[in-house]
């Protein structure tokens, strides 16, 4: 029997294969993701010209970029700037990092992409160990006469091991 559009349960819904997760880093914001050993991470620069700053913490909460084979470039000034804003989402993110006992003050970061990056360009990374990663899409407020908004990044995580545990079946709040 041929598949037809009648078989589509939710039109427009992008269905990912098992073990693949999609995260969006909003322009000017950040996203934290728990990464496990041998997970593959693809960072996609959707619209181009967007810098991506990455900070990685090992299972002990210490900054360790080598887990993703990244080199230290700066002491994560852009991530710190985003976290030190006094808006509600920044305060929530800072609280979550403190709950995880991650020392953001002493953390280092690496910069992926630059202002010359083409739209759709991506980079793939592979985790060597369990870690918590913070991905940021930093940028200044848009100047009307320059048309320079920060844009979103897409993070695709392909899990090395697909878990069917109860904690992964519950939708978070």
Per-region residue spans from a language model:
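Acidic, Ser/Thr/Pro
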Residues: 1-173
């Amino acid at each position: 029997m041929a598949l037809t559009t009648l078989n589509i349960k939710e039109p427009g819904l992008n269905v990912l294969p098992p073990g693949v997760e999609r995260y969006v880093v909003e322009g000017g914001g950040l996203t934290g993701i728990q990464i496990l050993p041998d997970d593959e991470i693809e960072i996609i620069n959707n619209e181009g010209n967007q810098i991506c700053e990455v900070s990685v913490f090992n299972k002990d909460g210490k900054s360790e970029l080598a887990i993703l084979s990244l080199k230290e470039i700066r002491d994560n000034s852009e991530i710190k700037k985003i976290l030190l804003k006094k808006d509600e989402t920044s305060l929530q993110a800072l609280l979550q990092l403190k709950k995880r006992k991650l020392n953001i003050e002493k953390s280092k970061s690496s910069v992926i992409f630059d202002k010359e990056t083409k739209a759709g360009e991506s980079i793939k990374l592979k985790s060597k160990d369990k870690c918590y990663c913070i991905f940021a899409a930093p940028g200044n407020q848009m100047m009307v006469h320059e048309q320079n908004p920060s844009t979103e990044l897409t993070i695709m995580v392909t899990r090395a091991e697909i878990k069917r545990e109860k904690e992964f079946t519950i939708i978070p709040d």
